[in-house]
Each structure stands twice: as structure tokens, then as C-alpha cells.
Amino acid sequence: MSEDIFNSEFLLAGTNKVLRNRSVLAALTNKQSNDDGSLTEEEIKWLERRAHDGFAIITTAAAFVHPSGKSWSGELGVHSDEMLPGLIDLAGRINSHGAILSLIHI
């Protein structure tokens, strides 16, 4: 009998973190962030639901790393320390469901 590799736990390479499965929420352009790039409560709850529903890795929407790199209204920003409280909150909520957060930037 073969192992169900998609639904079994596995060790994330290079870490001591065991993930519940290999399901990854791909980066989506959801345009839910505030004008300054900070996360909205709506966006945090939307991503948290994905972790609750079974994804082991939650990937954020594309994020800009410098103010001049913002490409559209509602884009997530990771360009300053002012963004950290929302990102830390999001990571904590994702982790509370046994998942991890992955940031993607453009």
C-alpha cells in the first residue's frame, strides 16, 4: 500500500517544523490591504480561514518591498516596520491552526 504523501505529515526541509500535509495556498492577488499596504482585518481573517480549513502553508498576496514598488491599490506592503504588527498578528493566527506563513514579494 502506498503512502498518501499529500495528506501525511512531513518535516519542512532545513527546519524542525512538521507540517500536517503538503497543501499550499498559492499567492493570489486579492487587493484587500489598506492604502498604506498594511493588512486589513478582512484579509487576515480570509487567510486564517484557509489555514483553519487545512492548508499547511499560506502564501500571502504579492507584496511590495519599497514604496515605489507598489503596483496596485490594495497591494500588501512589507516595506517598513509599520507593517510588522499586522504581519505578526497574521503569522500568529496562521500558526494557531498548525500552518505556516510564506511571504511573496514582487
Show the residue positions of the predicted features.
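Short, well-ordered coil/turn segments that N-cap beta-strands
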Residues: 20-23, 55-56, 92-101
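Active-site mouth loops of central-metabolism enzymes
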Residues: 30-41, 75-78
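N-terminal amphipathic alpha-helix/helix-capping segment at the start of soluble metabolic enzymes
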Residues: 2-24
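Amphipathic, non-transmembrane alpha-helical secondary structure
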Residues: 41-44, 48, 52, 85-88, ...
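Alpha-helix-loop-beta-strand connector modules within alpha/beta enzyme cores
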Residues: 76-99
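Conserved small/polar residues in nucleotide/adenosyl-binding loops
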Residues: 104-106
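Catalytic domains of carbohydrate-active enzymes, especially glycoside hydrolases
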Residues: 45-65
